[in-house]
Amino acid sequence: MAVERQWLQSWFEGTPVRIEQRSASAFSVSVPRSFCFEAGATQVLPPLAALLDKVAQSLKRQPEARLLRVAAPGDAGAAPALALQRAEAVRRQLLANGVPASRMAAPSAGEGAVVLLRVGFAP
């Protein structure tokens, strides 16, 4: 997974995207909400779409890897359902990029103000 983490980092160096090794077999990718969704909306913005395309490419290069977590935040003061709807939009974008549903965790509402993906090998 270190090779895939480094490959993704090379694409997003100098951007607000954070890619961090979590263990020998997993890394996380986080993107600030402002680069992902307009306030109150669930449509994926182009910066997040570009990142999801690269994550999909990475998963295709590592057929045993999975998305262990797909989480998105809501907006301050918004209904909690917004976060889950956004996570579902992220998942749909990954499906459209060729990532099979069987390789993704169910979408979840995230905490904080970032879209969070955890990539790794299932235990």
Predicted regions and their residues:
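A generic structural signal for beta-strand entry/edge sites
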Residues: 24-28, 112-114
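N-terminal targeting leaders that direct proteins to extracytoplasmic destinations
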Residues: 1-26
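Periplasmic OmpA/Pal-like peptidoglycan-binding modules at the C-termini of bacterial envelope proteins
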Residues: 85-123
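Short, surface-exposed beta-strand segments enriched in small/polar/acidic residues
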Residues: 30-38, 52-87, 104-111
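Short, glycine-rich nucleotide/cofactor-binding loops
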Residues: 40-48
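Extracytoplasmic/secreted proteins, especially bacterial periplasmic and envelope-associated proteins
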Residues: 3, 7, 47-54, 85-89
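Structured segments of extracytoplasmic/periplasmic soluble domains
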Residues: 10-15, 54-62, 90-100
